[in-house]
Amino acid sequence: SDLQTLEIKARHNEKVIIVTEGGKERYNSVYNGLEALKKHGKVPDYVLIHDGARACITTDLIEKCICEAEKYKACVAAVPVKDTIKISDENGYAVNTPDRKTLWQIQTPQSFEYELIMDAYEKMIKDSARGNITDDAMVVEKYTSVRVKLTQSSYKNIKITTPDDIIIAESFIKK
């Protein structure tokens, strides 16, 4: 509602441009946000899509992602994986071990030229066989020919989803 938007804007020093409803799935929420920008005539050159659960983001990472989006059209914050990763079969048996040197843990922000991500999302929304979409980079990878650049992030940019994550995030914030 307009009242909720005013309350959010008051609390966040007018940094909030538009407030829109989320969706059933993550991709629905992102698409709703992209659509709201267009509907309200606030179409930017670039958008950064970020998880609210990643509270330890830094200004430096945001600025880096903006620069990378300007240079590459599409980029995602990421860190090299530390652990060995296994591919399993449907019964829970390991069937393959990918080379760890080629694996990255994807984070947010995920940064794109607005028109690129909007076009990709519009194609995805029309595709009934879209499959399991877990991040915005997947949408660009699947529905455009643009390659997504992996932008070195920090292991401190964690997603807070469990009580243990809260303890870890608090330790980062206290430093």
Where are these regions (language model features)?
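Conserved beta-strand scaffold positions in the cores of enzyme catalytic domains, especially
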Residues: 19, 74, 148-150
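Acidic donor-binding segment of Leloir-type glycosyltransferases
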Residues: 1-18
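A generic structural signal for alpha->beta connector loops
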Residues: 13-16, 71, 91, 145-147
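Short, conserved catalytic or adaptor-binding loops enriched in Gly and charged residues
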Residues: 8-13, 96, 140-141
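A general structural signal for well-ordered alpha-helical segments in protein cores
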Residues: 3, 27-30, 49, 62, ...
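Conserved beta-loop-beta/alpha segment of the NTase-like Rossmann-fold superfamily
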Residues: 16, 25-88, 107
